[in-house]
Amino acid sequence: MKILQTQNLSKFFDGLKALNRVNIGVEKGSITLVIGPNGSGKTTFINTVSGFYRADEGKVFFEGKDITNKPPHEISRLGIVRTFQIPQPLKKMTVLENLLIAPEGYGERIFHSVSGRWLKEEEEIVEKAFRILEFLKLDHLWDSEAQNLSGGQLKLLEVARAMMKDAKLLIMDEPIAGVNPVLSHSMLERFVELKKMGVSFLIVEHRLDIVLKYTDHIYVMANGSVIAEGKEEDILNNPKVVEVYLGAQDSEIECGV
């Protein structure tokens, strides 16, 4: 069952077609990867799906419902959480505080409760936050200010905030960009555990040498269109994909193949 499906999704900028009838689907409880060279339309695609850009043609369906051109805050309430290449935490707040203000509808009340005045329902949220931090191996940093975290830890904090919102689908723009290989693998292993719990992922990523083995399905984009899709072995053995990545270069593909 597909939790997300686009149908002939197109987007224009100044008369130029940035997305050309794109059909991409994400199975529930899967990790779907979108790859392609710079300028292929990957980021435009996820921005259009998550409501930051308006689609000019086509449809976006989430859990079978048409969500085309809904604003980002409405899409977020449905269980779709978009994370960005550069994390956007509240830097002066601690890791725990960043999680406590994440759930929709609590906001300021939770923030003031950090000083120690907990209501029963707030205690449950704090317990949930600590469970998530432990799962992501961030629990030892709970009282650290976000501005003191490493790049990889900030990426995990974004995931933790999404989990606080009970995300059904995480749309992630280069989640392991700038993250060392050890932490990258650890992060992706956490994603695999989350997908076993029913969470779905739509990921745009360039570091294919690390991410490919964790994915269930891959779409390759070029010039705003999907040119190939399939499993890892299908993509790596597809001459069209090799041609797109190599271009005029007689060197290895970015993924090391």
Swiss-Prot record:
Residues 4-248 form the ABC transporter domain. ATP binds at residues 36-43. InterPro entries: AAA+_ATPase, ABC_AA/LPS_Transport, ABC_transporter-like_ATP-bd, ABC_transporter-like_CS, BCA_ABC_TP_C, P-loop_NTPase. This is Probable branched-chain amino acid transport ATP-binding protein LivG. GO terms for cellular component: plasma membrane. It comes from Archaeoglobus fulgidus (strain ATCC 49558 / DSM 4304 / JCM 9628 / NBRC 100126 / VC-16). Probable component of a branched-chain amino-acid transport system. SMART domains: AAA. Keywords: Amino-acid transport, ATP-binding, Nucleotide-binding, Transport. Gene3D superfamilies: P-loop containing nucleotide triphosphate hydrolases. GO terms for biological process: amino acid transport. Belongs to the ABC transporter superfamily. The keyword Endoplasmic reticulum does not apply. It comes from the Archaea. It holds the Pfam family ABC_tran.
